[in-house]
Amino acid sequence: AIGPVADLH
């Protein structure tokens, strides 16, 4: 994804 938090899943 674009946001770092979105990729933490």
From Swiss-Prot:
Cu cation binds at residue 9. Its cofactor is Cu cation. Keywords: Copper, Lignin degradation, Metal-binding, Oxidoreductase, Secreted. It is found in: Secreted. One of its GO terms (molecular function) is hydroquinone:oxygen oxidoreductase activity. One of its GO terms (cellular component) is extracellular region. Transmembrane segments: none annotated. Optimum temperature is 60 degrees Celsius. Its main location: secreted. GO terms for biological process: lignin catabolic process. Optimum pH is 5.3. Its EC number is 1.10.3.2. It comes from the Eukaryota. It catalyses: 4 hydroquinone + O2 = 4 benzosemiquinone + 2 H2O. Binds 4 Cu cations per monomer. Belongs to the multicopper oxidase family. On the 2D-gel the determined pI of this protein is: 4.27, its MW is: 54.49 kDa. Lignin degradation and detoxification of lignin-derived products. This is Laccase-1b. The lineage of its organism: Eukaryota, Fungi, Dikarya, Basidiomycota, Agaricomycotina.
